[in-house]
Amino acid sequence: TTGTVGSSLTGSYGNLTLNSDGSYSYELDANNTDLQKISTGEYLYETFTYTITDEAGQTATAQITIRIEGINDAPSAVNDKETLDLDETSEITNFDDSSKYVKANDTDVDQMDNISIDSVRSGKTNESGSSITVGSAFTAQYGSITFFADGGYNYTANSGLRDSLKPGEKIYEYFTYTITDSKGLT
């Protein structure tokens, strides 16, 4: 692609503006998915070739190479919902089905980053309810739950809960979890 001095030239990862005095500016394309994938310690390079001409019409060609250093992006958590039909069972166990883990739909754009469950609380927000220790059973309002760092969990409804509900009655139990990537961002 050919550009004009003083105008923006679009590259693979951003836009370069080269001025007639030799100065230049480079602006990254924040929406570029390739840029989002690189993590701390990883690099991408973008090279632009330019030609200069002197008053006698003599030309020379050179290159500007931009080194783009990756940064650690925070992971993104997505709300999960599980339904327990007490007419069928009193327990939710998903140890053997990772597609049902709470972190199965959570992501981190850094390709090599691993996500783990860092903390859990009872309630709808991080500020509400009680702290739950990952890996330990917690007695909640309607049952007992154990969350695991890999996103698996086990929930067992309280004994007698089924008999205490009216036909068709629905109750809700909320838990809030925080995920952390391998570099400590949540």
Where are these regions (language model features)?
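Extracellular ectodomain surface segments
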Residues: 1-11, 60, 74-138
